[in-house]
């Protein structure tokens, strides 16, 4: 039984690398099943967001190199390139890492709540793929509990700091009066929902939500009094859009340089502010080369985020302590579980010996033997049988000079110093 947490994130890899290592929702089930089959991982889950791609694995004797090799091969990367950005946590450190991630302590935005939902989705997908068993399942449940306690017992989530908030904060710096601005939001997921909420609260003049399906776009638009369109309508909407914020799960760019260039001409080169939160990117990087376009990626949000984190630093210290306690408690309980099978086997063996001696005593009583003599023989016989195997093994270990095993046996049987009966025979 061992755990591995392996991956890359915004601190170790550029957005170029992250988008190449990202998994689409459609890939996850097949990727998990392939991972377990080819690497002999016993249990596995994958967390893939715009800021990180991580693999959580339970195994018996598996090196991180085989997992890295699988990940590099799956995404058609060189092993050296991936290894340069990857990190590996094992056992206790892996447990603590998972709990830190779920609590928002390892996020670009300290304490952001979205990561817990993403972690729960990773668990649900792994269950669907059939790659989560009892051990990784227990770890996920302990991780969710630790993250919930961090939210409940600290102030780490009190202030509205998130990637979505950072994107809107940048927009406020570009446009002094957002109430005169029009925004085009591409996507309809959790991040875009947060962006829409922030823009709506700031009184943005008009919000348009573009999505692959009109139904999902309409649901989000209705919540904030916005307009819903399809992705194919984006070129027409660009002409009136001062702010464009995109976050989809598309594997290919949705917005190219040509479409933006055409929109700028019709806008008479009135500036467009763009934030691409997606990984892989939704907006071609070449769009940033255009005059009158302010294009920011996820990595560009670091500075804005840093300015909004000061109020959370104190809470983070308390959260780290809670996570450490949670990780230690989980590993302690897991190690206790490792003894369950041994204890069960020992109990079954003891009960078999008991039943044998009891049957013998019952036969003696049926044959008219003295009850007191039968009880004495029952007690002696049971004691001898229970002690036989341990006695043989202890003598063998002693002959081999295994002082450590003898000391362990003394602790196992709760034999303190002076507990030996020294009554003369």
Swiss-Prot record:
<feature type="site" description="Important for activity">
    <location>
        <position position="97"/>
    </location>
</feature>
<dbReference type="InterPro" id="IPR036453">
    <property type="entry name" value="GluRdtase_dimer_dom_sf"/>
</dbReference>
<dbReference type="Pfam" id="PF00745">
    <property type="entry name" value="GlutR_dimer"/>
</dbReference>
<dbReference type="Pfam" id="PF01488">
    <property type="entry name" value="Shikimate_DH"/>
</dbReference>
<protein>
    <recommendedName>
        <fullName>Glutamyl-tRNA reductase</fullName>
        <ecNumber>1.2.1.70</ecNumber>
    </recommendedName>
</protein>
<feature type="active site" description="Nucleophile">
    <location>
        <position position="50"/>
    </location>
</feature>
<dbReference type="InterPro" id="IPR036343">
    <property type="entry name" value="GluRdtase_N_sf"/>
</dbReference>
<feature type="binding site">
    <location>
        <position position="118"/>
    </location>
    <ligand>
        <name>substrate</name>
    </ligand>
</feature>
<comment type="pathway">
    <text>Porphyrin-containing compound metabolism; protoporphyrin-IX biosynthesis; 5-aminolevulinate from L-glutamyl-tRNA(Glu): step 1/2.</text>
</comment>
<dbReference type="GO" id="GO:0008883">
    <property type="term" value="F:glutamyl-tRNA reductase activity"/>
</dbReference>
<dbReference type="InterPro" id="IPR000343">
    <property type="entry name" value="4pyrrol_synth_GluRdtase"/>
</dbReference>
<comment type="function">
    <text>Catalyzes the NADPH-dependent reduction of glutamyl-tRNA(Glu) to glutamate 1-semialdehyde (GSA).</text>
</comment>
<dbReference type="Pfam" id="PF05201">
    <property type="entry name" value="GlutR_N"/>
</dbReference>
<dbReference type="InterPro" id="IPR036291">
    <property type="entry name" value="NAD(P)-bd_dom_sf"/>
</dbReference>
<keyword id="KW-0560">Oxidoreductase</keyword>
<comment type="similarity">
    <text>Belongs to the glutamyl-tRNA reductase family.</text>
</comment>
<feature type="binding site">
    <location>
        <begin position="112"/>
        <end position="114"/>
    </location>
    <ligand>
        <name>substrate</name>
    </ligand>
</feature>
<dbReference type="InterPro" id="IPR018214">
    <property type="entry name" value="GluRdtase_CS"/>
</dbReference>
<dbReference type="InterPro" id="IPR015896">
    <property type="entry name" value="4pyrrol_synth_GluRdtase_dimer"/>
</dbReference>
<keyword id="KW-0521">NADP</keyword>
<feature type="binding site">
    <location>
        <begin position="49"/>
        <end position="52"/>
    </location>
    <ligand>
        <name>substrate</name>
    </ligand>
</feature>
<dbReference type="InterPro" id="IPR015895">
    <property type="entry name" value="4pyrrol_synth_GluRdtase_N"/>
</dbReference>
<comment type="subunit">
    <text>Homodimer.</text>
</comment>
<feature type="binding site">
    <location>
        <begin position="187"/>
        <end position="192"/>
    </location>
    <ligand>
        <name>NADP(+)</name>
    </ligand>
</feature>
<keyword id="KW-0627">Porphyrin biosynthesis</keyword>
<feature type="binding site">
    <location>
        <position position="107"/>
    </location>
    <ligand>
        <name>substrate</name>
    </ligand>
</feature>
<dbReference type="GO" id="GO:0050661">
    <property type="term" value="F:NADP binding"/>
</dbReference>
<dbReference type="InterPro" id="IPR006151">
    <property type="entry name" value="Shikm_DH/Glu-tRNA_Rdtase"/>
</dbReference>
<dbReference type="GO" id="GO:0019353">
    <property type="term" value="P:protoporphyrinogen IX biosynthetic process from glutamate"/>
</dbReference>
């Amino acid at each position: 039984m061992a755990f591995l947490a392996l991956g890359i994130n915004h601190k170790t890899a550029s957005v170029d690398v992250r988008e190449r290592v990202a998994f689409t929702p459609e890939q996850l089930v097949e990727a998990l099943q392939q991972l377990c089959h080819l690497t002999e991982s016993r249990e596995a889950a994958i967390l893939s967001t715009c800021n990180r791609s991580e693999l959580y694995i339970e195994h018996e004797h598996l090196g991180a190199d085989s997992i890295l090799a699988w990940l590099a091969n799956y995404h058609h990367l060189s092993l050296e390139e991936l290894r340069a950005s990857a990190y590996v946590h094992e056992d206790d450190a892996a447990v603590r890492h998972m709990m830190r991630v779920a609590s928002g302590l390892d996020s670009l935005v300290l304490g952001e709540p979205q990561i817990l939902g993403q972690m729960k989705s990773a668990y649900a997908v792994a269950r669907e793929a059939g790659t989560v068993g009892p051990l990784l399942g227990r770890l996920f449940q302990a991780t969710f509990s630790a993250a919930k306690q961090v939210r409940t017992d600290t102030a780490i989530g009190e202030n509205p700091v998130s990637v979505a908030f950072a994107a809107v904060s940048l927009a406020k710096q570009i446009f002094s009066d957002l109430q005169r601005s029009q925004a085009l939001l591409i996507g309809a997921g959790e991040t875009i929902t947060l962006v829409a909420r922030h823009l709506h609260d700031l009184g943005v003049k008009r919000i348009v939500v573009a999505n692959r399906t009109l139904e999902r776009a309409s649901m989000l638009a209705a919540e904030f009094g916005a307009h819903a369109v399809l992705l194919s309508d984006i070129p027409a909407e660009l002409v009136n859009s001062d702010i464009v914020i995109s976050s989809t799960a598309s594997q290919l760019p949705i917005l190219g340089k040509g479409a933006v260039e055409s929109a700028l001409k019709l806008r008479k080169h009135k500036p467009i502010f763009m934030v691409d939160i997606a990984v892989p990117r939704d907006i071609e990087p070449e769009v940033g080369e255009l005059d009158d376009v302010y294009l920011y990626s996820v990595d560009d949000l670091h500075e804005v985020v840093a300015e909004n984190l000061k109020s959370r630093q104190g809470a983070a210290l308390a959260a780290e302590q809670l996570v450490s306690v949670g990780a230690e408690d989980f590993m302690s309980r897991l190690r206790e579980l490792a003894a369950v099978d041994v204890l069960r086997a020992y109990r079954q063996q003891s009960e078999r010996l008991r039943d044998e001696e009891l049957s013998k005593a019952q036969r003696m009583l049926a044959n008219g033997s003295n009850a007191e003599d039968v009880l004495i023989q029952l007690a002696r016989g049971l004691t001898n049988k229970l002690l036989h195997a341990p006695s043989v093994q202890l003598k063998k270990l002693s002959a081999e000079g295994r002082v450590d095993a003898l000391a362990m046996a003394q602790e196992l049987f709760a034999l303190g110093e002076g507990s030996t009966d020294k009554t003369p025979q």
